[in-house]
Amino acid sequence: MKLHQLQALMAVADGGGIRAAARILGLSQAAVTRALRELEEEQGLALLVRHAGGARLTPAGKILLPHATQIASQLQRAQRELAQLRGQTPARLCVGVTPWLGQTLLAATVRAFRQALPSVQLEIYEGLQAVSLPLLRSGLMHLALGPAATLPAQEFIHLPLARYRMKVLASHEHPRRQARSLGELLEDDWVMNFGHSGYAPVVHELFERHGFSIATERIIGAQSSAMLSSLIVDAGLLGYSPEPMLLCAPLRDRTQALDLVEPLADAEVSVIHLRDQALDTAALCFIQCLQDSLKARGRSRSAEHRQLAAMLELRF
């Protein structure tokens, strides 16, 4: 397999046909067709189905596509790093940050990082799994800060940072804000963030392991911390979130954690990166700045900083 063949496959997937792929790549249609035909002949498999409206990937093409994307991304990264050595382009670091950490620790971490490596171009995403995992796999994101318990170990490496408690959250006006058991909350509507595994693991963790069953239509999935928080505060839904979210706007001062008899799960925030992608100097510096910020919270004079430190058990 050659790079130009994989680029042709990716362009067809993006554009939906040979003509669009040629336009994306700046090549002739004949050149794109030739590259794809050579790739199919080498693999002994049909990778495309041509039709009147363009072309679509076969099952074999769909299997090859993510590998092609990763190979192209890694080559681009190698080209960037070599260009950095030549002084032609600035270094770049892309990080996904879980929402509660973004609101409580990101500012101090970024200040320290900018002082240490001011020439690095930093890009930050709100790092819910639905956003971070595809970017990590493509090589466009270098590391993510978030829960790693359900991630495949053969694909990702994770460095634990801190353990925290999960909590059931309700607004101060919620009619069941004084509930003492999950059994009292089965007829209420909930909002949760699901990882790549869907809602089933969360439902088991929160309800089923305690002997309760809840209708899944009562659970709204929110892939945005802003939407999740708004639905708890403004729509009167119950939430299941990391305890540090209580320190984050708009939940701070408007919600409370329910004091339930059932023990809720602990979770862990980790540094996550691809197993086959080593961390460079910028990534390692960012991690060190974050670890320093975490440790500093326990020594801070700020009551809010000490409150966060009390919610966390450091794991490094």
Please give the residue ranges for each predicted region.
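A short LG(V/I)-centered, amphipathic sequence patch enriched
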Residues: 40-62
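Hydrophobic hinge/microswitch elements
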Residues: 128-141, 147, 196-258, 308-316
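Alpha-helical linker/hinge and terminal dimerization helices associated
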Residues: 42-43, 64-86, 286
